[in-house]
Swiss-Prot record:
Catalytic activities: shikimate + NADP(+) = 3-dehydroshikimate + NADPH + H(+)
Coiled coil regions in record: none
Name recorded for this polypeptide: Shikimate dehydrogenase (NADP(+))
UniProt subunit comment: Homodimer.
InterPro entries xref list: Aminoacid_DH-like_N_sf, NAD(P)-bd_dom_sf, SDH_C, Shikimate_DH, Shikimate_DH-bd_N, Shikimate_DH_fam, Shikm_DH/Glu-tRNA_Rdtase
NCBIfam families from the UniProt entry: aroE (TIGR00507), PRK00258.1-2 (NF001310)
Record's keyword annotation contains S-adenosyl-L-methionine: no
HAMAP family cross-referenced by the UniProt entry: Shikimate_DH_AroE (MF_00222)
Origin species: Neisseria pharyngis
GO biological process, one term: shikimate metabolic process
Binding, shikimate: S17, K18, S19, T64, N89, D105, Y215
Amino acid sequence: MNTIPRYAVFGNPVAHSKSPQIHRQFALQEGVEIEYERICADIGGFAQAVEAFFANGGRGANVTVPFKQEAFALSDEHSERALAAGAVNTLILLENGKIRGDNTDGLGLTDDIAKRLGVEISDKTVLLLGAGGAVRGVIPVLKEYHPARIVIANRTHAKAAEMAVHFDIDAVPLDELEGGFDIIINGTSGGLSGQLPAVSPKIFEHCTLAYDMVYGEAAEPFLAFARQSGAKQTADGLGMLVGQAAASYRLWRGFAPDVLPVVQYMREL
């Protein structure tokens, strides 16, 4: 019988996921052997795929696009973060056989900004671009840092307005945004196709940090635009990716990985 602990990331598509390499580095830090695989679940077949994984020795799983809401629905119990976000990116098999859903996206983002990059969030004005699942998942943890104001802006304003009411933050139409933001976070997926959010360069004039939740080349169009428009510092989402993975690993195994060397390792791949 295979006694090596099994973990996985579920998504569709998922072949591009860097999670296996990241978790392998965490296991090396802990000094253990784990299995970590990518599982491409069929649209409409996510719940069955998760059930089969846990029935065959799975201990925990990460969940990425487009299954985070479905992961929330199938979880038997939820962390406060997951309840606040309405989405789950981490599934934990409990000793009683039930599945607990958590959301570590917000921890990954705020740890990266506040700890690794050393940028203050409390009493600052934060702009979130986009109103999808990625943004929804980070708002509850951002609020714990007590920023002076959180503003959300999205191509479809109604979606941003709905999220603003839900989280008690502000929504402003993209074309009405002006300056005055300390931290600007791009949570749109436009960078994957080279598109920029339809915003004025003026929004970056007093910006301490422009941050893109995606990483690598996909983040570069937005970050280059931010730099040219006056942002003092820019960062892609690699630290967030490693940070949310580290939080998941800690929930599964009770071991807190050191994020910094893994960010460096992934950057050099």
